[in-house]
Design a protein with these regions (language model features):
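C-terminal motif of bacterial Sec signal peptides marking the signal peptidase cleavage site
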Residues: 14-16
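Canonical tetratricopeptide repeat
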Residues: 86, 120, 154, 189-190
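Bacterial signal peptide processing site
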Residues: 18-21
Length: 203
C-alpha cells in the first residue's frame, strides 16, 4: 500500500526471531496494494492523519512514538482499523503476540479486506510460534499481491521452523526469484535456515 510503509520494519524485526550473528539489515520490501481493499469504514481525517504519522514513526523504528500516535488515532476513532493493526503489531513485538493479536483481529473484523492487517497478523502469529496460522495469513497477502516477496519469505521461515525442508526451500526459492540478493542476505544470517546451511539446494 502506498500509504503504508511499515511492513518492512515488521520483516526486519522478525529477523530477531533468529540471527546467527551480526545485525540484520533491512531488506527492501514492496508495499502491499491498497487496490484490493474494500472500504467498509470511513476514517475521519484527524484520525487518518494521526495514523499516517504513527506509520511513519514506526517505519523509522520509533516504536514508542508510533504507539503513542496510534493510540491518539484510535482515541479519535475507535474503528480506525489501520491504527488498530499498527498498534497490534507494535504490541506483538514489544510486549507479546497475545497482547497484540486482539487489536489486529479487531482491525480485520472492521475491514476484512485490509491486506496490511493480514500481513501484520501473519507476523504476529509467527512471533507466537503459531506457524500454521502465520502461513494462512501470509497466503491471504499473496492472494491479494502475488509478487509480495516477504510473504513468500515469511512462509519459508515458518516451514523452516517446522523443519519442513522441501516446503521451506520451495518458498525460499520463490522469495529469492522476486527479491534477489536482499532475500539471500536475510536467509544467510537468520537461524530459521541454520539446519539447511549445508544443504546443496540451500546453497
Amino acid at each position: 500500500m502506498k500509504e503504508i510503509g511499515y511492513a518492512l520494519l515488521a520483516v526486519l524485526l522478525l529477523a530477531g526471531c533468529g540471527l546467527d550473528s551480526g545485525e540484520e539489515k533491512a531488506p527492501a520490501a514492496e508495499d502491499i496494494p491498497a487496490a484490493q481493499e474494500i472500504k467498509v469504514h470511513e476514517i475521519p481525517a484527524i484520525s487518518e492523519t494521526l495514523y499516517h504519522k504513527a506509520a511513519q514513526a514506526y517505519g523509522k523504528g520509533h516504536r514508542t512514538e508510533a504507539l503513542r500516535l496510534a493510540n491518539q488515532a484510535i482515541n479519535e476513532d475507535g474503528e480506525n482499523y489501520k491504527a488498530l493493526s499498527l498498534k497490534g503489531i507494535i504490541l506483538a513485538f514489544d510486549i507479546s503476540p497475545d497482547e497484540g493479536i486482539p487489536f489486529i483481529e479487531k482491525a480485520l473484523s472492521i475491514s476484512p479486506s485490509y491486506v496490511q492487517a493480514d500481513y501484520d497478523m501473519a507476523v504476529a502469529q509467527k512471533l507466537g510460534r503459531h506457524y500454521d496460522e502465520s502461513i494462512v495469513y501470509f497466503q491471504k497477502v499473496l492472494k491479494a499481491d502475488p509478487q509480495n516477496t516477504w510473504s513468500y519469505y515469511g512462509i519459508a521461515t515458518n516451514f523452516a521452523d517446522k523443519r519442513d525442508r522441501e516446503e521451506a526451500l520451495d518458498y525460499l526459492e520463490k522469495a529469492v526469484i522476486l527479491g534477489g540478493q536482499d532475500v539471500v542476505s536475510a536467509a544467510s544470517v537468520q537461524d530459521h535456515f541454520a539446519f539447511l546451511r549445508e544443504d546443496a539446494e540451500f546453497k
